[in-house]
Curated annotation (Swiss-Prot):
This is ER degradation-enhancing alpha-mannosidase-like protein 1. Keywords: Endoplasmic reticulum, Glycoprotein, Signal, Unfolded protein response. It comes from Schizosaccharomyces pombe (strain 972 / ATCC 24843). The keyword Glycoprotein applies. The keyword Cytoplasm does not apply. One of its GO terms (molecular function) is carbohydrate binding. Alpha-mannosidase-like protein involved in endoplasmic reticulum-associated degradation (ERAD). Delivers misfolded glycoproteins to proteasomes. It lacks mannosidase activity.
Amino acid sequence: MGSLHSIFCVCLILLCIFKENSIVGAINSARMVELRETSRRLFYHGYNNYMQFAFPNDELAPLSCEGLGPDYENPNNIGVNDVRGDYLLTLVDVLDTLVVLGDREGFQDAVDKVIHHINFERDTKVQVFEATIRILGGLLSSHIFASEEKYGFQIPLYKGELLTLATELAERLLPAFRTPTGIPFARINLMKGVAYREVTENCAAAASSLVLEFSMLTALTGNNKFKASAENAFFSVWKRRSGIGLLGNSIDVLSGRWIYPVSGVGAGIDSFYEYAFKSYIFLGDPRYLEVWQKSLESLRHYTASLNEYYYQNVYSANGMVMSRWVDSLSAYFPGLLVLAGELELAKKMHLYYFSIYLKFGQLPERYNLYTKSIELNGYPLRPEFAESTYYLYRATKDVFYLHVGELLLSNIENHLWTPCGFAAVENLEKYTLSNRMESFFLSETLKYLFLLFDDDNPIHRSHHDFIFTTEGHLFPVTNQTRLSTSQRIYDGGEVCVAEDYDRSKWPMLYSLIASRDDYDYVSHLVGIDNKAIPSYLIDPSGVCKRPEYSDGFELLYGSALVSPIKSVERVTNNVYISDIIGNKLKFVQKEGSNSLFLYTAGAESINENDTVFLTDPDYETFTRPDALYFDRTIAQLENPNSGQKTFGKFLQFDNDNSLPSKVFKTVLLNNSMCQKPSDTLDKDTAYIAPLGNCSWVQQAKNTNKAGLLILITDGEFINPLENIHSQNSLFNWVKPYIPPTILLKNENNFVSKWANVSVRQSDFDAPSYFQGTPVSNLYLCLKCINS
């Protein structure tokens, strides 16, 4: 097959017709160098202070200027102990960042310190996932750079000590995989192993996102047990997906049952998707590509917002929305979409996170989609948004992403800098800082920002194919990692770049992103105006365009989804729903329209010219007037003498009983029935009266002795939800008899000239409403049900 560059990556020569009105503030080569060096300076401010105040502890406390290690006094403090294993966390995590910065002397010195100071014989219980991605990944990446001459960082007299340490750590982690399912325990004590009666809950991401590191260890040592354990865990999680292809968030490692059956792309599940696609790149195994493709298909259908600016959390069994927020971890997803060639989706999603970033100055841990406010406060120096910005720039070379990176650097330096490091934000609204600088800030956030502004970095050279792990560690993609794969499909590198980008041909002062017609609309979704957007990121002549549909709502009758093949069937432009139970219905509203539109039915997407028919005979059990209901109120009136017909609207008739089949004689009344008539009414007569100023219910009550009431209207609004209990009364629970009542438009007043009339319910398809709002493309097929 062709290379990954041609199959998946959008490695672009931009097909742009630049206009004068596309100008966004320019970043020239000198400014690029300046921003690159700013990234370098910020890194060393954090790194040097860690080495001065915190080494050999795991983390630097940036406010108190001291080192931080495990919380030995409180072993249950998993927020700390999951990552701090008393194993030089920050130093190991940043080793290959020194390579990216071109610091050969610093890299050699750091490797020497790791070799002489690290010790895994520690009585600390760490998270298997964190130890793998931060420590194991850091050791493996650094071993490769230290041992291979071609990368320019080979260390004289280096004897593979980092690989030995990596192997020792992996051996200490392997007992966690000894479960009936092959899914590892979340935590393990480095000295004592898995604790007796250890918690059996693990999240999908932590259980499955170990493939890259363990496969690299197998490639370097030749011992297949590492790769086999990680692969078994990955596919053990995958095979427990729901019937609609969605994973849950947390799982019981002993039984394999989902504990928290909620799906999304954020915390608890994020890196599963990342490692599905990256494992395909790294190993060339088509099984991982299949997992990615099926996952993305289900995510787009069940979790994506209508216009795919963000992905929501839904119940994995039925796709119903569970929460109304997105978290900062999910900001990695645009970058992953870039790698998979879904560039347009990546741009849209990145714009949404960028708008949130502008609103608060950083990405909050959780952002509420509907209140447009912070749901979970804080910013712990996470790298995901910087990572996606980097990938999008490498794929598009659009100056917009350089400006985004410039903003990130500026906010870091101006708001997060402390005399001895950089501090996480505890409260974004008050911008109070917390005394913590997690290792990923140096190993990922500043690494991606440095690479964003360093086009000429050796990492970007075409003959060096690297893949970033979920912790930002660099693994070279070589034949060695794919030797055990029977079918090699992958032939190219992971980082998607426009390799022959010619600055003289494509000046950097142009941006296609700032000129997008949905640029302002995304800001509107988040609730910010142009005043919050830097002027150099605004196209003054840009065109604003609103999407055709706004996000709507979903309905699901029953607790789980049924197979869409059994209950939803398409015949050309008609879609038939034979069973409403188990089919999620998504309704949206067109911009500027007073009606709703059924957008999806089960797994079927509804097109503009489609008509949807419900053929479920039990529909009345699940519909009601104050929610989804079908207006079976078309009345067919007929002159039995001439055969002339016309149609009106039933305001009242008993669905449980057949309409009277007899012929009524007609009587025309000059006055409305808002007042009780003085004469006795006849049950064999149809009374025709003008619609009065009182409610139709009151008029029908006043005509309760009649056989039929026909109200003539000039087009006044009649509330279809008004019913016989609408009048305030102590006796509203008693249902009085009122005759069948029909509303007839004035142009059909010729009925009053008929001597007799018969009436029945029409066989026309019944239109649908949701809480009184019409649904333009959904009908109840009465003929289908009656037959």
